[in-house]
Curated annotation (Swiss-Prot):
Induction: Induced by MurNAc 6-phosphate that releases the repressor MurR from the DNA. Repressed by MurR in the absence of MurNAc 6-phosphate. Residues 55-218 form the SIS domain. Homodimer. Keywords: Carbohydrate metabolism, Lyase. The active site is at residues 83, 114. Its EC number is 4.2.1.126. InterPro entries: Etherase_MurQ, Glucokinase_regulatory_CS, MURQ/GCKR, SIS_dom, SIS_dom_sf. Coiled coil: none annotated. One of its GO terms (biological process) is amino sugar catabolic process. Disulfide bonds: none annotated. This is N-acetylmuramic acid 6-phosphate etherase. The gene is murQ. GO terms for molecular function: carbohydrate derivative binding; carbon-oxygen lyase activity; ether hydrolase activity. It catalyses: N-acetyl-D-muramate 6-phosphate + H2O = N-acetyl-D-glucosamine 6-phosphate + (R)-lactate.
Amino acid sequence: MNLGALVSETRNPATMGLDEMSTLEMVSCFNQEDRKVPEAIEKVLPAIAQAVDLAAAALKAGGRLIYLGAGTSGRLGVLDASECPPTFGVPHGMVIGLIAGGPGALLKAVEGAEDDAALGEADLVALDLTATDMVVGLAASGRTPYVIGALRYARQLGCPTAAISCNPDSPIAHEVQVAISPVVGPEALTGSTRLKSGTAQKLVLNMLSTGAMVKLGKVYENLMVDVKATNVKLVDRACRIVVEATGAERSQAEAALTQTGFEVKPAILMILAGIDAQEAQQRLQQHDGYLRAALTR
């Protein structure tokens, strides 16, 4: 493939004079380019919605959501996956991020890893991939062999698949059920896809994981009601969430949380339904953890 022909690799005529600009002119130029990212995302929202539905269905069926990429793309997948347990209270391993070259590649590039299609497949084999898992490949260029190899293996197993690329009609788009291709144009710094392309991928991942978790009942209204109160900040957030959801005084929210082991959902249910902690837990179990359903019983 002629990489120079990729949109993400071409020169940006608006930034030719970067090295001659004042600092303010330079950062203003970056900012103008970044404005193109949400516009590109808007054009692919239907595809993102499809991917959210696939991810939610896979997770409901007991599968996993697996992100996979090289370099910046891989790091972004690992970042999004690592935020899911504390934010949504899901177990580690439910959302997984893989990067070409393994964990060490998060800090230091592993030469040649992204060019090895067999490595992508091997990394999924090591996870004991099954057809219930969803695999999402990330590659700004849309042609990374590591990602293509993984997606082909996932497709052979019958996994739901999606790909996130910033080039139109890319090779990985032809390997998946859902292709998400926000075309953000040439980078301000030629070929540096950690810039607009990376931002676009992060925005898509935000929507994908958050949207799936909303559909799994991890959100009530716009509150993260399955947050794990693992530090002082999150204990305070848990209390504020209960107050926001119920209108109760902080002291009442703290009392309810103490009885539920600082689990937010049953604490909210206790206050709004006027029941004790045990009944709140039982009612949530009856409704598969969906707080709104438990409240409207």
